[in-house]
């Protein structure tokens, strides 16, 4: 166990709760001490929706520790079933309450005798997996549960839909721009003449899960959530799945060609090449923009990328392949799936970093001094401290990355959003310089603390004034080089002379 003040992927129960609260009319009961019940607050604060978060904490307190949990947990399940009339109640412990080693399966069986809805225990090892793995596992478990139930009752629909159709699997609450991506994917499918059979888990009813096998294929836009459910549906019903993320012009075209191959193999006769050409040349502005003078100004500029596997890999490819930007390193916090990530990005960047340690990532950014960062909320903080602009491309994210306006990252509209994000994330040198000369909005205090440790150096007044004269787009670099020079020589007060000496040393 490791103590951390920042986690990229949360503990396992957060993943289970994300999936359970994404479904319609599903209630989750969290068997946990008070400190673990922050999910309700987090989701209510971040997700822009009107419904309350359907999660109840069955609190582990001293009475529970003295008498055992069964009575309390069973009572809570029955009470919620009566009050909310959910279709399903999902019980999940947390890593803390798992220490008690209680037979929660028995609690579920006991409670289900007195409930109208279904009751299920989330079958997740809280010490072995993180939020994303648990979400993937819980989604598969719920899908399995309802398909087996339908089989048992004999009301599993036979055969496929008449027209080509798709299940979009993995759209969930608290995901990065998930709702916008879902809307864009539905539009894309409609343009391709493909009906959307089901979208799970977001706003899906568990009673419709029995219809999943009717689709011609499954689309898994995010590698982190949905793969296990898709693999189960493939092994059980032979439904093929496509796990190519349609992010960027090249990957969107590759995804569409794969869809063409899959539906034609099942008796359809479609050709999407004309559609791809039309979208790439006329609808998406990204292909045109990448050849424009604006984008050529970015050619060769240095960037770093960090996030979950899906977004970090897609973004690395877009920057290197479609925009000519030099990706110094690309990284992911999904250590459990590191081999896939390496295979995807190694030819598009100089170095691959696999780490869950935000300090290590911050130091890696400070070391290479990129022109822009593309990462999570944490890298945004790092960028602010280093005075390096950052575009947020992956969860975990804060409120400003749950936009009310339409901002998908997938499909052809997504390519436009990404092009804007990339271009606006780079500080344009002349613009920055002119703003400071004419006293624009960007005349903030320039001395920032270092990323690895608090700055122990004192900048004298005349040195500070000289630093202010340096154009903003290189000021951070000048400051860091000067401080490095001073530290190496044991100088505590940085004067004009020290600045000039540092400049000469770097020049030499």
UniProtKB/Swiss-Prot annotation:
Its EC number is 1.3.7.7. This is Light-independent protochlorophyllide reductase subunit B. It comes from the Bacteria. Belongs to the ChlB/BchB/BchZ family. It catalyses: chlorophyllide a + oxidized 2[4Fe-4S]-[ferredoxin] + 2 ADP + 2 phosphate = protochlorophyllide a + reduced 2[4Fe-4S]-[ferredoxin] + 2 ATP + 2 H2O. The active site is at residue 294. It comes from Trichodesmium erythraeum (strain IMS101). GO terms for biological process: light-independent chlorophyll biosynthetic process; photosynthesis, dark reaction. The keyword Nucleotidyltransferase does not apply. Binds 1 [4Fe-4S] cluster per heterodimer. The cluster is bound at the heterodimer interface by residues from both subunits.
